[in-house]
Structure formats: C-alpha cells, structure tokens
C-alpha cells in the first residue's frame, strides 16, 4: 500500500503486526495477544490521525493512488452497465466514462471522471483530465438521459480539465460551459458525488446537481493548492498554506452550503476499505435519489438552477 507521510507511524505498527503474524505461522509462538494489542493501537492511532487531518493532508488522501475511482464504483454499484462512447463530433475521451445501467433496480445514466490505477491506465484515461470531447460526450449522455427520463449520477474526480493547446483549440471552455448548461437544464434527478479531487471548471462541469454529495476526505476547489500557491506566493512550495485558505474540505464546503451532504469514509480513508466505502455511498445515493423521485421535471430544473444561482448571490445583499 502507498503510505502517506503522516501515515508512517501507523504503517510502522502495521509492519510489526505482519512480522508477528509471520512468526506465528510457524506455530511455535503464541502471539495472538500481542497482535491484538498492536491492532488496538493501530485502530486508535488511525482514528486520532484521521479525526484531525489538515486541509493539505486531506488533499493527499483525496489523491491517494489506491483510492477507488469511477470504474471501481461502477463495477460494484451498477448492474448491467452498458458503456457509451464518443461525442459524435470529434473523438472518444476515456478521461470520462459514461453509460446506462441499473442502480438498486432503477435505470440510471452514470457519468464520471476516471483517473486510472497504474501507469498504463493513467495514460489511457489522461489522469482524469478531460478534453472538450469528454465534456461533449457527457453533455450527449445527459441529454439522452433527459430524453428517456432516466436519473443521472455523476462521479467527480479530476485535478481539472486538460489544459493542453489542442484542447483549447477545440473549445475547452465552451465544452465545459455547455456541460454545465446541460446539467442545469435537464428535467430528471441529477445527483453528483465528489469522490476524490474536484478541481475547478473541469469538476463543476459534472457537479451541477440537484444534490451534491462529497466523500469525507475528498476536496473541491476553484484551483489546486499548488496552482493557487504558484499565483499568490510565486511558488508551489506554499501549497500547504494555500490548502488552508481555499476552504476545500467537505466539512468547510458543507458549512458554506456548497455541498448538501458529507458521506463518511471508512476509518483511515476509502483506500483502506473500498468495499465499505461502496456500501456507504450506495446507501447515500439511494437516499438522494429517493428524495428526488416523483418530483416534476420542471420543479427539479427550477430548484437546481436556483440552488446554484443562490451561490452566486452570496454576500451581495
């Protein structure tokens, strides 16, 4: 497992546990009591460490390479998933995954950023940084869901939209704006979940939902801490300071009413117990969809638009 800097004391204890278990395999020494005591220390240290994470530490957890990504959630939560590809204008962008499936018996359209889990898949999915064709694909799938009256689930996990010259030449800003516009206009329930990183316009292009959920240790911000530090302090080395100022944690954003609910993560983060994370998110999604089911399409659309317009009015009165 990839160990974060602040997790090293925990990892050392876990290493001792593994050593003792290895010795115990020989059957010569009964060390069950010692293992039990060390495990209790690990659990206590995990709780105390993760209960007081700084914004910068939460940023590291949100970026953890073993954190579950969109494809993992789809394979666990969605039955009969049928992937849909291409923007019908230029190309397929595998930074955004989307398709139809069934969630707890109901048909849904699910769309999300995919970062990949190793070198090969990270390159394939462009580290979750979508190009214009990715956002145009998302727009197409949302319009399809609207046409067939199918609820939409979006999973957000990106450092930001791809900033390359080729993406700009193909209208990156326009594609993001059209995706946001489509989110605001559909007349079906739309539930968005920030599962890892929620970076800038590349994130909000899929996060303009009726209900916005956010995992406990995810982050959501107008800019990355490194990008903010490079602008304000002229050095990315001040990323820790920038993270403190950006109010990017789920807890801060819930207080500011930017998100609707914080979804608890397993002790030690989603990467330590992906199965439990899937179960918890499944229940949260089911509850959110139930709350929205039965509402008229016009009401869903009006509430969603008003929700985000109200954010823009903050501090004006």
From Swiss-Prot:
UniProtKB keywords: ATP-binding, Cytoplasm, Fatty acid biosynthesis, Fatty acid metabolism, Lipid biosynthesis, Lipid metabolism, Nucleotide-binding, Transferase
Self-association and partners: Acetyl-CoA carboxylase is a heterohexamer composed of biotin carboxyl carrier protein (AccB), biotin carboxylase (AccC) and two subunits each of ACCase subunit alpha (AccA) and ACCase subunit beta (AccD).
A GO-annotated cellular component: acetyl-CoA carboxylase complex
Physiological role: Component of the acetyl coenzyme A carboxylase (ACC) complex. First, biotin carboxylase catalyzes the carboxylation of biotin on its carrier protein (BCCP) and then the CO(2) group is transferred by the carboxyltransferase to acetyl-CoA to form malonyl-CoA.
EC number: 2.1.3.15
Primary gene name: accA
Record-annotated CoA carboxyltransferase C-terminal domain positions: 41-291
Record-linked HAMAP family: AcetylCoA_CT_alpha
Cited SUPFAM superfamilies: ClpP/crotonase (SSF52096)
Localization, UniProt: Cytoplasm
Protein origin, superkingdom: Bacteria
Keyword Nucleotide-binding in annotation: yes
Pfam families: ACCA
Catalyzed reaction equations: N(6)-carboxybiotinyl-L-lysyl-[protein] + acetyl-CoA = N(6)-biotinyl-L-lysyl-[protein] + malonyl-CoA
Keyword Transferase: yes
MF annotations from Gene Ontology: acetyl-CoA carboxylase activity; ATP binding; carboxyl- or carbamoyltransferase activity
InterPro entries: Acetyl_CoA_COase_a_su (IPR001095), ClpP/crotonase-like_dom_sf (IPR029045), COA_CT_C (IPR011763)
PROSITE patterns: COA_CT_CTER
Pathway field: Lipid metabolism; malonyl-CoA biosynthesis; malonyl-CoA from acetyl-CoA: step 1/1
One of the GO biological process terms: fatty acid biosynthetic process
Name of the protein in question: Acetyl-coenzyme A carboxylase carboxyl transferase subunit alpha
Family, similarity comment: Belongs to the AccA family.
């Amino acid at each position: 497992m990839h160990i974060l800097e602040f997790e090293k004391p925990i990892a050392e204890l876990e290493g001792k546990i593994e050593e003792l278990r290895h010795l115990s395999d020989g059957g010569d020494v009964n060390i069950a009591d010692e293992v039990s005591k060390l495990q209790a220390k690990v659990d206590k240290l995990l709780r105390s460490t993760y209960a007081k994470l700084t914004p910068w530490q939460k940023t590291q957890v949100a970026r953890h390479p073993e954190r579950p990504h969109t494809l993992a959630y789809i394979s666990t939560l969605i039955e009969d998933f049928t992937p849909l590809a291409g923007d019908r204008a230029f190309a397929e962008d595998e930074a955004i995954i989307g398709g139809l499936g069934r969630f707890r018996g109901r048909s849904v359209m699910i769309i999300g950023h995919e970062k990949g889990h190793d070198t090969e898949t990270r390159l394939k999915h462009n580290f979750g940084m979508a190009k214009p064709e990715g956002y145009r694909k998302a727009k197409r799938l949302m319009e399809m869901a609207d046409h067939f009256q199918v609820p939409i689930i979006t999973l957000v996990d990106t450092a930001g939209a791809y900033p390359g010259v080729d993406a700009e030449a193909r209208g990156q800003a326009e594609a993001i704006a059209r995706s946001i516009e489509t989110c605001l206009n559909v007349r079906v329930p739309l539930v968005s979940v920030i599962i890892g990183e929620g970076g800038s316009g590349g994130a909000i292009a899929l996060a303009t939902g009726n209900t916005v959920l956010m995992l406990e240790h995810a982050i959501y911000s107008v800019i990355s801490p490194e990008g903010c530090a490079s602008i304000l302090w002229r050095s990315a080395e001040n990323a820790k300071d920038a993270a403190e100022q950006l109010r990017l944690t789920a807890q801060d954003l819930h207080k500011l009413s930017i998100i609707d609910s914080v979804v608890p993560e397993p002790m030690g983060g989603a990467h330590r117990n992906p199965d439990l994370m899937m179960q918890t998110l499944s229940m949260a999604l089911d509850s959110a969809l139930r709350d929205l089911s039965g509402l008229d399409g016009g009401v869903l659309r009006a509430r969603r638009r008003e929700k985000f317009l109200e954010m823009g009015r903050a501090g004006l009165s």
